Amino acid sequence: MKKIEISGTCLSFHLLFGLEIRMRRIVFAGVILFRLLGVILFRLLGVILFGRLGDLGTCQTKPGQYWKEEVHIQDVGGLICRACNLSLPFHGCLLDLGTCQAEPGQYCKEEVHIQGGIQWYSVKGCTKNTSECFKSTLVKRILQLHELVTTHCCNHSLCNF
C-alpha cells in the first residue's frame, strides 16, 4: 500500500466512528466564505420578499394597535454604565469597578488616552455633567511628550462596555 503525503498545512477533523476529514486552509476558508454568502443572500431575499430585515411578518397587530419600542433603563430615572479604572487594548479591563448608576441627565463615558498615535489605556464610568462629554484635550507632559485625551459619551445602558 502506497502512503500519500500531503504537503502544506491541513486542518483535520476527527468525527465519530474513526472518520477523519482533512482540508487545506484555502478549502476551509472557502467553506466559511460560502456559508457567509448564504447568510447574506438569505437576508437579501428576506428584504426583497418582506421589505425589511429582522421579523419576517410573524408579529400580528390589531388595527389601531402600535408596536412599542424597547424601554431602556434610563427611561425610568437613570442608566447603568460600566466602571473601569484601567482598560488596556487587547487585554480588557484590569481594574474593574463593576457598574455605576448615572442619574437622569448624566451619561456613560469612555475616556481614551492616546500617546504617539497609539491608544495606551482608557477609563470608563459615569459623568457628573454634560461638560465632560465629547471633549478632546492635548496634555503636554515632561520631556515634551504629548498625550491626547478624548472623551466619548453615550446614553444607553452598558453602552460603554
UniProtKB/Swiss-Prot annotation:
UniProt xrefs under InterPro entries: DUF4723
Name of the protein: Uncharacterized protein C9orf57
UniProt superkingdom: Eukaryota
Principal subcellular localization: membrane
Spans through the membrane: 30-50
Alphabetical keyword list: Membrane, Transmembrane, Transmembrane helix
Localization in the cell: Membrane
Membrane topology, as annotated: Single-pass membrane protein
CDD domains assigned to the protein according to its UniProt record, in alphabetical order: TFP_LU_ECD_C9orf57
One Pfam family recorded for the sequence: DUF4723
GO cellular component terms listed in the entry, alphabetical order: membrane
